[in-house]
């Protein structure tokens, strides 16, 4: 995920919380809001201190960023996303995080179908 595709400022996060809709599963809460006139989607990540110390929180953020980068072609442009990690995500692998994010994005109707990985659908690799 490119740096220009990240939400950084508190005002940007607050705008998504106020204007957007939310969806959740056991590991993540996803807020999404349309933002007209953007060339790409933007995403912000929030990992609370309940998750662990700074090393653990930063690892979780890196894994979430990588999972979002893998889904980048499936996320429509003109969206602002805020991803909030819930406790328990720190023990997950990258693949598990990617599947959980895909699930919550489908619930939020951000992604319409399963992304294609290596020519196969439904997330199975091979």
From Swiss-Prot:
UniProt GO molecular function: 3'-tRNA processing endoribonuclease activity; ribonuclease P activity; tRNA binding
UniProt keyword Hydrolase, yes or no: yes
Keywords of this entry: Endonuclease, Hydrolase, Nuclease, RNA-binding, tRNA processing
Pfam families, per database record: Ribonuclease_P
Record-level GO BP terms: tRNA 5'-leader removal
Family that this chain belongs to: Belongs to the RnpA family.
Record's subunit section: Consists of a catalytic RNA component (M1 or rnpB) and a protein subunit.
Function of the molecule: RNaseP catalyzes the removal of the 5'-leader sequence from pre-tRNA to produce the mature 5'-terminus. It can also cleave other RNA substrates such as 4.5S RNA. The protein component plays an auxiliary but essential role in vivo by binding to the 5'-leader sequence and broadening the substrate specificity of the ribozyme.
Entry-linked HAMAP family: RNase_P (MF_00227)
Protein name: Ribonuclease P protein component
Gene name of this polypeptide: rnpA
């Amino acid at each position: 995920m490119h740096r220009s595709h990240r939400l950084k400022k508190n005002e940007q996060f607050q705008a998504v919380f106020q204007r957007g809709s939310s969806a959740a599963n056991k590991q993540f809460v996803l807020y999404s809001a349309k933002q007209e006139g953007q060339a790409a989607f933007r995403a912000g990540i929030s990992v609370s201190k309940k998750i662990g110390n700074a090393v653990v929180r930063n690892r979780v953020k890196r894994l979430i960023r990588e999972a979002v980068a893998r889904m980048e072609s499936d996320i429509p442009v003109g969206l602002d996303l805020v991803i909030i990690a819930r406790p328990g995500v720190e023990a997950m692998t990258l693949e598990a995080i990617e599947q959980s994010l895909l699930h919550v994005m489908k619930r939020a109707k951000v992604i319409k179908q399963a992304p294609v990985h290596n020519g196969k659908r439904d997330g199975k690799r091979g």
